[in-house]
Amino acid sequence: MAAGLEIRRARPEELPACADLYVRVLCETFTWQPPERHRREDFLQAARSEEVYVAVEDGRILGLAAFYRPQNFLHSLYVDVRNRGIGKRLLDHVSAVASGPVSLKVQAPNKLAQLFYEREGFTCVERGQDPGSDVAWLRLVREPDSPA
């Protein structure tokens, strides 16, 4: 676990760096999609209506979580450095500020994310496919008192 790691709300001036992290991690992770599909503008647009939390260590943003409070929906969770507990810390923070069960969607080919969320107490409640997409998704939910 990252001891010197701070989880907090992103400052407005940090959103461009968050958008860069978002695009970089998407391009590395979502290899089944063309890189040009992942755009900074998409993140910045979504961030206008979401709460963006960051994991910061030594002034560097190592991860982010974008949370849409009206639906307790975790829209994005991306980390720059894996296997340090950063994703778990961000996820736990979002769960702590949520007003009920947190839900999210994960693309079916993203097996590492599915394993991570299942390990953190999420269960699959729905499977589907967005219109115009050939990639299936799973909607996962974690109840507030789920052991993680």
Located regions from the model:
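Conserved N-terminal entry element of GNAT/NAT acetyltransferase domains
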Residues: 1-13, 142-148
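Acetyl-CoA-dependent GNAT
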Residues: 9-82, 91-93
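Short hydrophobic/aromatic beta-strand or adjacent loop that forms the aromatic wall/cage
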Residues: 50, 134-140
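Active-site beta-strand termini and strand-to-loop segments that position acidic
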Residues: 56-58, 140-144
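Conserved acetyl-CoA-binding loop-helix of GNAT-fold acetyltransferases
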Residues: 83-96, 115, 119
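Short glycine/proline-centered loop/turn elements that form peptide/ligand docking sites
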Residues: 87, 91, 109-113, 130-136
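Conserved GNAT acetyl-CoA-binding A-motif
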Residues: 97-109
